Curated annotation (Swiss-Prot):
Root EC class: hydrolase
Provenance organism: Trypanosoma brucei brucei (strain 927/4 GUTat10.1)
Membrane topology: Multi-pass membrane protein
Disordered, as annotated region: 808-854
PANTHER family to which the protein is assigned, alphabetical: PROTEIN SEY1 (PTHR45923:SF2)
Stated name of the protein: Protein SEY1 homolog
Record's subcellular location: Endoplasmic reticulum membrane
UniProt similarity note: Belongs to the TRAFAC class dynamin-like GTPase superfamily. GB1/RHD3 GTPase family. RHD3 subfamily.
Task performed by this protein: Probable GTP-binding protein that may be involved in cell development.
InterPro entries: G_GB1_RHD3_dom (IPR030386), P-loop_NTPase (IPR027417), RHD3/Sey1 (IPR008803), Sey1/RHD3-like_3HB (IPR046758)
Cytoplasmic side: 1-724, 770-854
Entry's transmembrane regions: 725-745, 749-769
Length: 854
């Protein structure tokens, strides 16, 4: 019989040649397509599914197996020509599709009535396998190939026909009982596997040829006794010791008249016999029990045949359920790969749009619809395979598609987060600047315990440097410094979190602000919660990265950063106005507070204490109706800013002794290279340590030099600005001008005029003298004088209000016209924007306290 070619469809294929080689899978696939629908219908195998059957035939050589199949199924298997020779005709195994008798179906259609006629379906495709005959001289006593074919037939065929001559019933060799013994053994081998389904047993159809008796029952009984005897003599597993042959086979019997002597009767019997295969209404219909079939989808048959034959030829233990499991995994893997490749193409198109900066409306919805379509296609392609394998692969496919979707959404979110970060750049910078300004003002209030009495020291121009060193002996309140560092980072954390909280909000009050943050993407993503979640996460990561880089830059230039704070604390008041010193005592008193403020900021630069931690979300928010798989994962990844506070980090601070010595570095703290993000880990993350021990020492000494130089310049300004009269001038003026002074004191009108003139023309001088009074006099006197001046100012506003008071106090207050340098990554300075002015009483109390501490 001619083999099947990939280009030309003939009536059958030589499935296994006489050398034991199976036809390639591609050729088997082409044959199946051609046999089912002809060329150009590549999806016919998928549409066929498991709706087909396979029938195989076994028997002795030259026993008429091919003749039986040709008569029964109208096939064209090659038959023996007795006129020329008797010998082997079928070598290996041939396969073709049966041509069912049109007369049978026409008869059924004629018997059908009404709706039954319309509902009647075409018969399912039937493939026929013609195996090489046994007991041939060509193979001799070699039964290995015979056993391989038997095992292959039982693993493929739903029904196995045993072709036997009626006259050989009751014989052993002539009836080919060796073949039956082989069939029983290999089928028992298949059934011995624990994964084998007991109901899935093949049908063994015994056909007695050339039967001339009237009653076939005695012959059937004899055949059954022969089967039972063979079954009893074979070695069985323990679980089948007491089992009968019916456990592993569904035995059926049929007799046919003599092919030559009773040809009309033979043809009639064959026609009736055919109904067993094609007519569901027939009481002997062979395909009524679906659990008996192999259940291999048509599109997986080539792979299944190849796997089974390879396992048989390699002498492996053939397990049909395992083979079906392997086939299911193979087909599911192919379908999964096709779905992933298709989704990759979709992702590539979207990636190009993202790189171009295009706005993609309803992005998540489009991706979800694509994934749902691919999952449905996968389900349709694999629904006929093993359910557990399909379910497992479908879950893996959904997870992989979800990962790809999430990656693409994050990529899109990052492109939008660039716009959001640009809009929030000022917020990020101001959070640090505000924290530094707060620290600068509050650190001045840290109590210093004097370690040396320097009240009697006088600093002249020549002994300036030594005087500065002598005053820098204050002991630092270490506990309060640590609290300031903690509060510094908490303020930054709260400021940033407050700015980023609205990115996760969807209230109407936030929509206007969000629109300005999202820019051109606002309209497209306001209704896309998954993208908004991704943008919020990406923006927070970007802010964390940007903020950390800024502190790294500040730490790299720590001396200049700390010196800027020292300089601003020294030359400005707590309300932001400029402070001018008239005396060296006032300057040296403020210098200790300013130096303390710089040291506390240095403690803040030791360790970067912010991190992103997951946020617990409500189950309803994650699993609510309409929630996409991408949104569920993004919501679970929602995070917030938090100050690092594990046990080791709570103690990882600089220890200050006094303002003139290098702070003690916490060298004993355990560190770890990998940041686990676990707040319970008792380690310090080495990547977040901004200042090493050596860097701290270098920064402190350089800062001290800069601070000393700044102090010297301020002292020189004070010394150069001193304008004082000789001590003898005032007594002489009082003595010589006593008469004029007496006349002035006794004339109220003239006295009032002189006071008004002095206030108007000597206001600046009087203020400077008041500042000198504040710096040199005791605190009780300063407070009393300022209280008196405040009462006078209140009386003036009550009885002679100025234009500013009449206008509601809208007059401009004094501020330093020069802008101070801000703390940035480049200069590591501190921005000094003017804060709201404190009340006069509060300012007096604060300055008085400073003087008292001095």
């Amino acid at each position: 019989m001619a083999a099947f070619s990939g280009e030309t469809a003939v009536k059958g294929i030589h499935l296994i040649n006489d050398d034991g080689e199976l036809l390639p899978e591609a050729d088997i696939n082409d044959f199946l397509i051609s046999a089912l629908a002809g060329k150009g219908s590549s999806d016919i195998l998928y549409r066929t599914g498991v709706n087909y059957h396979v029938v195989g035939v076994f028997g002795g050589q030259s026993s008429g197996k091919s003749t039986l199949l040709n008569s029964l199924f109208q096939t064209e298997f090659m038959t023996m020509d007795e006129a020329h020779h008797r010998g082997q005709t079928t070598k290996g195994a041939f396969m073709t599709r049966a041509i069912l008798d049109a007369q049978t179906h026409r008869k059924e259609r004629e018997e059908g009535e009404g709706a039954d006629l319309l509902k009647r379906e075409k018969p399912q495709p039937l493939f026929v396998l013609d195996f090489e005959g046994t007991d041939g001289i060509e193979r001799g006593e070699d039964q290995n190939f015979e056993r391989q074919l038997s095992l292959f037939a039982l693993s493929v065929a739903d029904i196995l026909i045993i072709n036997m001559w009626a006259v050989d019933v009751g014989r052993f060799n002539a009836a080919n009982m060796n073949l039956l013994r082989t069939v029983f053994e290999v089928n028992l081998q298949l059934f011995s596997h624990g994964s084998y389904v007991k109901e899935e047993k093949p049908t063994l159809l015994v056909v007695l040829r050339d039967f001339t008796e009237n009653d076939p029952a005695p012959s059937f009984e004899t055949v059954r006794k022969s089967f039972d005897k063979i079954w009893g003599n074979i070695q069985k597993p323990e679980s089948f010791t007491d089992a009968t042959i019916d456990v592993v086979f569904d035995l059926r019997y049929r007799v046919l008249p003599h092919y030559k002597l009773q040809r009309p009767e033979f043809d009639s019997a064959v026609s009736e016999f055919r109904e067993w295969f094609v007519s569901p209404k027939n009481s002997n219909f062979l395909f009524s029990n679906c659990s008996m079939f192999r259940g291999v989808p048509a599109d997986g048959m080539p792979s299944y045949l190849s796997n089974c034959w390879n396992a048989i030829c390699s002498s492996k233990d053939l397990d049909i359920p395992t083979q079906r499991d392997m086939l299911a995994r193979h087909r599911c893997a192919d379908a999964k790969h096709a779905a992933i490749e298709e989704f990759k193409e979709v992702c590539e198109e979207y990636t190009k749009k993202i790189q171009r900066g295009d706005v993609i409306p309803q992005f998540t919805r489009a991706l979800e619809e694509t994934i749902e379509r691919l999952l449905k296609n996968f389900s349709d392609q694999t629904k006929l395979y093993k359910v557990s394998v399909v379910h497992e692969t479908a879950e893996a496919l959904e997870e992989e598609l979800g990962d790809m979707e999430l990656h693409l959404l994050k990529q899109y979110a990052k492109s939008i987060a660039v716009t959001v970060l640009a809009a929030l750049d000022g917020v990020i910078g101001s959070s640090v600047d505000e924290a530094v300004r707060w620290l600068q003002n509050e650190a001045r209030s840290v109590l210093l315990l004097e370690g040396k009495d320097n009240k009697g020291d006088r600093i002249d121009g020549g002994g300036l440097a030594q005087g500065v060193l002598d005053t820098a002996e204050g002991l630092v309140d270490n506990k309060r410094c640590r609290l300031f560092v903690e509060e510094f980072w908490k303020r930054i954390c709260l400021s940033l979190q407050g700015a980023f909280d609205m990115l996760n909000g969807c209230s109407k009050s936030h929509q206007a602000a969000l629109s300005s943050l999202y820019g051109k993407f606002a309209t497209a993503i306001m209704d896309d919660q998954a993208v908004r979640e991704g943008v919020a996460h990406a923006a927070m990561e970007g802010a964390q990265h940007k903020l950390r880089n800024r502190f790294v830059a500040m730490a790299e230039n720590a001396a200049e950063t700390v010196h800027q704070v020292f300089e601003q604390a020294l030359t400005s008041k707590t309300d932001g106005t400029v402070r001018f010193f008239r005396t060296t005592d006032g300057l040296l008193g403020a210098e200790k507070q300013a130096r303390q403020a710089g040291l506390v900021l240095l403690g803040c630069l030791l360790y970067y204490r912010l991190k992103l931690v997951p946020v617990e979300v409500d189950a309803g928010e994650v699993e609510g109706e309409g929630t996409t798989r991408a949104l569920q994962r993004l919501v679970r990844d929602r995070c917030r800013f938090q100050v690092r506070d594990n046990r080791t980090e709570k103690n990882f601070f600089l220890h200050f002794t006094n303002i003139s010595d290098v702070p003690r570095y916490p060298l004993d703290a355990p560190t770890s290279v990998v940041d686990s993000g676990d707040t319970t880990a008792d380690t310090v993350n080495a990547d977040n340590v901004l200042l090493s021990h050596n860097a701290l020492q270098c920064a402190f000494h350089l800062y001290k030099q800069k601070a000393d130089f700044t102090l010297q310049m301020q002292l020189r300004n004070i010394e150069s600005g001193k304008q004082s009269l000789p001590p003898w001038v005032l007594p002489v003026m009082l003595l010589l001008g006593w008469n004029e002074l007496y006349y002035l004191l006794t004339s109220p009108i003239l006295l009032i005029a002189i006071i008004v003139i002095a206030v108007l023309f000597f206001k600046t001088f009087l203020k400077s003298q008041l500042e000198v009074l504040e710096e040199k006099c005791p605190v009780w006197l300063v407070v009393s004088v300022k209280a008196l001046l405040q009462q006078a100012q209140a009386l003036q506003n009550a009885y002679a209000p100025t234009e500013a008071v009449r206008g509601g106090g809208g007059g401009a207050q004094f501020r330093d016209p020069t802008q101070a340098t801000s703390v940035s990554g480049a200069s590591a300075g501190v921005s000094s924007e003017s804060s709201s002015a404190a009340s006069p009483r509060r300012r007096v109390c604060r300055e008085s306290r400073d003087k008292g501490e001095d």
